[in-house]
């Protein structure tokens, strides 16, 4: 059986690894390791003569060919964005596929055998569309993607391979080029389980580069009256120098930044020269690193843990090599971070271990990921009814019984949504389909079983089945919307910000739904009762029902509550009179009538679907 390689498909840089003789080994790029230990920079370039460049060769020529170079395509995965390059269009999947093809070729050269299968990692916050897009990119590259796993989960595998007999609470602090992911995991008896995830979608190494760029540019402007940031070529040179300085200051106390002929004036060429110390660098990045506190606090809160409960700290991503970053995280938790694995390589190595597990080369490891956001369907009144809560371990399958909202309803619409808001309109629509052919029946009678099934890659399949007829429809959620990692984080923040407002809105909808059900039940009760209820009682009920429906139409919540209470009391009084009347008719009739008046209190969720028009 051929090897299953592990691939860390990153925003700034990618990496790959494979398990050889039981140990994960990093796969080198054909060009060797570049600046800062980067094997496969996530750059794709097209030259004007039609040549395709990928990785370090593409990165090196980016300054001279900006219009033909694509960088950070990962941010566009799962969207319908198109890159327009020299008259041709490319999807993010195609761009990512070029990087994966490069990794595949170099892996085959390294191993001396064909490579067909891979495990690819994605950020913990990637939604169904983004995960599917990643699988599609693998397929375009000629790879059979055996599994999509979360990056922090892969990192845990890289560190946990030799610790199979311990029970641990682990925090993974993954600081990359543009994002921070904080994940807390439980590890025991070979099982990795995600407890919580958090992050900042605009915090990473590029922010540090930009801080250095701004500092140097401000200095240069004060001395020469020229803002280098307004000159594209000068800015690119400055940014490259800033990144180089950042990397060097992880191991030395000062570094020389020397950019001759950075610009020119009427007086001649201008040069930039500056000695940047580690102390000054740490001063520049301190506000950036301090932004880690909120995601760290949020992750602990989500896992219901305290700082002292954490047993291990794992640092992932190039910026975590910076001593100041490492010290910040260690000081936060009051313990030392783990060593022994290169932060730039850990994710790829963990993916390789998962590949070896799938290939049967490594035993006794079970991987349990979670879904990042709540999944559910839209029900009557626009309410989002959850089926699978956020942070549920996957793979998972959940079913729930729903019913119709109107008499003689023959079609229901299943609207699948994802998010943390109580109302479906505030969440993200993932897909919609109809279940037709439901036999006509009074509202509340049909039983529709809705099933959510998430596979090990986080891909969602939804089905709806009429239990009466056996008819079934389903949908597989693929890359059809534009929910990005930024939007996921925004949605979580909005859920907190609008919690009280959402609660009130949901309560109002539930009040209206309950009132409609009450009005329907009241009318049905007096109609079914016939002459067992006197006409004055019937007229009283009809009058209240009319007023209640008027209040529902005008959405007068206080009036709805008042009339609902009044109608409930009226129905109870009628029920009492009917019972007393029946009690005088003998034991047999009494028993029969009691059976007929029983309520159906099964698990069916009443009146949850609008009729499809």
Swiss-Prot record:
Similarity comment text for this entry: Belongs to the heat shock protein 70 family.
Keyword Chaperone: yes
Protein name: Chaperone protein DnaK
Transmembrane segments: none
Protein source organism: Picrophilus torridus (strain ATCC 700027 / DSM 9790 / JCM 10055 / NBRC 100828 / KAW 2/3)
InterPro entries per UniProt: ATPase_NBD, Chaperone_DnaK, Heat_shock_70_CS, HSP70_C_sf, HSP70_peptide-bd_sf, Hsp_70_fam
Superkingdom of origin: Archaea
Tagged with keyword Cell inner membrane: no
HAMAP family reported in the protein's UniProt record: DnaK
Annotated function: Acts as a chaperone.
